[in-house]
Amino acid sequence: MRIKQLIVIILIILVVLTALLPQLTHANAIVNESQMDKEVRQGMHDYHIPGLAVGVVKDGRIVFLKGYGKADDTGREVTPETPFILGSVSKPITATAIMQLSEQGKLRLDEPVLAYLPWLQVDGPTGGREATVRDLLRQTSGWSTYDGRAIMAAQGHTAEEIMERQGKLKLERQPGERFGYSNVNYMLLGAIIEQVSGEPYAAYIENYIFQPLDMTDSYADPSTARENGLASGYQTVFGKLMEIKPDISPALVPAGYLAASARDMTHFLLSQMNGGQYRDATVLSAASTGLMQRYEAGFPYGLGWFTTSEWISHGGDAENYHADVMMHTDGSWGIVVLMNTNDVLLTSLYGNGYGDLSFRLLEAAGNGSLFSSLLIEPVKFGAIAPYLNLGIAALAIWLIWSLYRLVGGPNSARHVSKWLIVRGSLLTVIDLIVPLLFLLQFPVEMGAPWRTILRFVPGWGHALFIIPMLFIFVWLLEGLLLFYRLRRTDRGHEVIEGLR
């Protein structure tokens, strides 16, 4: 009897292995691992990426999943289970939660935001129409990209606290008028999830998205993620990669600070590509998933996704992480790429090399058949660090010379002349007007306030803020000292009288 049972068990195992073998062989045949390795290594070298994880799905299956490089300064290796901060790839997950609550009848997409967040203060052109939940999802609320970047450095534990400290945010355009990407929208959606569900955002996401999708290495609380192996994020500080751990407000997690592994994100991606279903779990109906991904000609955003006629995607940029998620509209191919670095300055100057790498990895996975016509020469990061450091050093030397000139300037009446006044006027332009204009205009050009620039461009950002401030301080001291010297000399009185 025992022999018969043993034979039955062996036969069952053989049947299962026989069924799995073609799938495994097919998966290996689909993706050329050596080519993927080559592309990843080259990209990590070109874009100074310490660690990276990538997952590829094809026709409802994971066909490639691998980690590369280091997760932190201890040398811990990146694996497919290593969590990374997702940046704005958090937004499709937040949007999924909103769509769940809509399906349950707990909220209506076309209801005004104020119906759920009565504390919200809105100023600006409304055109007689209030922003709705759908406007937040589609990025058509009217809030600006600038304000969305400003809140990333704001202080506050909740969305209400952050909005109170920001003051009454003014709408840039009428709600529903046109697309305008802003992190404000998804911060408020996180607050709506809490209000409607009666649960903290983190608990809701973990219970109703992460658990059903078997996302066991994903976290809606950055502190918990750090305790469970989160890859350390790296930023460039004066040209050197350094581990940076900025404080993160829980209110901003829905817009940009969820954490997940590449393995887990392939589960989420598969659910989005399969009408809201992953294995036996259904987190969303096919109708709601289709609504999230629907493409409208001339409009770049669905409900939580960037959309085109062929591709559905989202990128994410936190201070020290980058992420990309892409899937084909026919449900065939999809990719997840997670990186533990971000250099806003280099991507602003040279182009989004990180996103370029993600495209190339998907193209390599598809053996050059997906969108090669869209790929041009790879983005290359220039060696700008030495020049920036040299420029900042020159400004620092100039500042020191200004201080020396101030201390070692004329102390007697015979040195006081009208020429000194003329020179003072010229220095006013150099030491006051130019630095002041720079401090005011640079945030406008960057599209973010100084406090956000300092978080995303540490080192160089701090130097570009502090040095102009010091020049202005030197100008004030120089003016006070000059006035004092003029007042205490007869020649100075003559000069002052002559200028009247």
PLM feature segments, named:
Residues 28-35, 46-48, 78-81, 85-93, ...:
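Extracytoplasmic/periplasmic, Sec-exported soluble proteins
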Residues 2-29:
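Hydrophobic secretory-pathway targeting helix
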Residues 24-52, 56-58, 199, 246-500:
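Catalytic loop of the DD-peptidase/beta-lactamase superfamily, centered on the K-T-G motif
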Residues 99-103, 190-195, 267-274:
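Short glycine/serine- and small hydrophobic-enriched flexible loop segments
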Residues 30-86, 122-125, 167-168, 225:
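Short, conserved catalytic-motif segment at the N-terminal edge
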Residues 82, 145-232, 240-266:
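Catalytic-site signature segments of enzymes, centered on catalytic residues
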